[in-house]
Amino acid sequence: MGIAPDDSTTVTPEKAEDLVRYRLAVGDIVLGRKGEVDKSALVNERSDGYVCGSDAMALRPRLGTVPEYLWWFLQSSGAHSQLEFWSVGATVSGLNQTAIRKVRLPLPDVQEQRRVASYLIEKTEKIDTLIAETERFIELSKERRSALITAAVTGQIDVRKMV
């Protein structure tokens, strides 16, 4: 959901002042401008003040739009379809301001937006936990499998009576 900084592409404080109009604020949403146009990140306190690079574009939600709700919408298949449809470029998909303005956002009242965002955070955290536990189980199972094979082929386990 957040932004991972790339220290290899930093700018000097002086240059950052020249780029003040591209400075990100908490609640902004950063989208990839080229290629994978369906990727986005929500600017949090840690990335507040970063400068948006030229291969990305920042959306600043309007008053009445909950940033987390907008970010979750951008994760949806409906948003992905619209972004792909309105993107430009024959070889590499690209987004511009015109394409973004054409995307239709279902916009309930602010309280409902907050409820939707909270619900999705709660449910996806549970799913992410289950995925992590499953991945850990798979890794342990692979280790167990490897140890079992090693033990069987080195004679540490007598398999003659098991087959």
Predicted segments — roles?
Residues R46, P61-G64, S77-G78:
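Short loop segments at secondary-structure junctions
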Residues P13, A58-R60:
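Short histidine-centered catalytic/ligand-binding loop motif
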Residues M1, R23-K39, V51-A56, W71-E84:
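Short Ser/Thr-interspersed hydrophobic loop/turn segments at strand-loop and sheet-helix junctions
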Residues K102, L107-V163:
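Amphipathic alpha-helical coiled-coil/heptad-repeat segments
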Residues L42:
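A short, polar/charged loop-to-alpha-helix boundary motif
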Residues V66-F73, Y119:
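Short amphipathic alpha-helical coupling segments at ligand-binding clamshell hinges
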Residues M1-I29, E45:
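Sequence-specific dsDNA recognition surfaces
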Residues E36, G49-M57, T65, V88-R114:
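A short glycine-rich beta-alpha junction/loop motif
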